[in-house]
């Protein structure tokens, strides 16, 4: 009870400039989510505190999910809660990745702060299937993320191989650094060697000791080509031979795990060991997604039948508040 009281005091202090009734309902829904453990309209309504009949509680949550003012100020809510946490950090390592969301019609783009243990969600953006990985949504996401975290001494955006040079260019334009994995058929111009190399050719040079290739030009013909510093690393086998949880039809996942890392960093001050250490933490965002989706240990995200971007976005906001409360505890 004391931990819950302290969490509420933190949230109320952070959200003092926002609408009091909406703030109260948001915190009440966060509590209900923690007790009910299902990110659905009916479960949250059933576990709301108070003497009202269950049907009225569910209607209250329904009205909350379609509140257009709350949807418009969600960036301000993320900012108000996150700012006190990141204010005194010397640098920010932020993992960004896509995930499926409730149904196959919607997807989530999430930014998570990489720390010791579980990462902390900073911002969620829900989009429809047609906008998955679109450049416009990437630009909007980075713009809103910039509003949330504000000015900071050093910011590293950590991404996997699905984010290509257009993304790098967007991040660099904000004055941030990228730490990411380079994959696919891309060619890189290695300044030290004075020649273009395919990633497969670079894989041969990788070992269990992180090594740098120096400055390189990413992509040969793309208009968004950019410069970065490349690092090689091939981790030791995990000793799971013959115990894969994947079927023979999904060899792709096994090959991805065995493939050496070609990591890129736009910060020349980072050495290979530091780049590998930062990138290794990227898997924390996958744990973040599992915390929301797991039907046994998480918020059972898949049970939600909400079917608009606005309603799902507010459900994600409720999950964010619930996760933050559990993280504090």
Which residues does each predicted region cover?
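Short secondary-structure boundary/capping segments within folded domains
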Residues: 33-36, 51-53, 83-86, 100-101, ...
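Short N-terminal secondary-structure initiator segments
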Residues: 50-74, 233-245
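Active-site-proximal, Lys/Arg-enriched surface segment
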Residues: 58-116
């Amino acid at each position: 009870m004391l931990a819950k009281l302290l969490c509420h005091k933190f949230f109320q202090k952070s959200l003092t400039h926002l609408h009091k009734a909406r703030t109260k309902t948001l915190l009440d829904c966060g509590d209900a989510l923690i007790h009910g453990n299902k990110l659905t309209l009916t479960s949250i309504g059933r576990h709301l505190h108070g003497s009202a009949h269950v049907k009225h509680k569910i209607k209250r949550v329904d009205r909350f999910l379609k509140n257009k003012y709350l949807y418009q100020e969600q960036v301000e809510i993320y900012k108000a809660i996150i700012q006190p946490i990141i204010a005194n950090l010397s640098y920010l390592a932020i993992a960004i990745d896509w995930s499926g969301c409730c149904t196959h019609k919607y997807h989530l783009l999430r930014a998570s702060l990489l720390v010791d243990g579980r990462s902390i969600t900073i911002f969620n953006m829900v989009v429809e299937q047609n906008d998955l990985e679109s450049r416009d949504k990437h630009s909007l996401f980075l713009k809103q993320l910039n509003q949330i975290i504000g000015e900071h001494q050093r910011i590293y955006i950590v991404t996997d191989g699905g984010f290509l040079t257009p993304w790098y260019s967007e991040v660099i334009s904000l004055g941030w650094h990228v730490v990411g994995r380079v994959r696919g058929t891309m060619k890189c111009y290695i300044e030290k060697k004075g020649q273009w190399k395919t990633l497969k050719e670079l894989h041969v040079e990788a070992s269990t000791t992180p090594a740098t290739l120096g400055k390189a030009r990413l992509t040969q013909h793309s208009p968004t080509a950019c410069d970065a510093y490349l690092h090689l690393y091939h981790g030791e086998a995990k000793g799971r031979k013959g115990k894969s949880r994947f079927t023979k039809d999904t060899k792709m996942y096994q090959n991805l795990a065995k493939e050496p890392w070609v990591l890129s960093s736009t910060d020349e001050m980072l050495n290979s060991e530091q780049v590998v250490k930062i990138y290794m933490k990227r898997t924390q965002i996958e744990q973040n997604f599992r915390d929301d989706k797991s039907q046994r240990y998480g918020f059972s995200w898949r049970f939600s039948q909400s079917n608009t971007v606005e309603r799902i976005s507010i459900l994600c906001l409720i999950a964010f508040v619930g996760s933050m409360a559990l993280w504090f505890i």
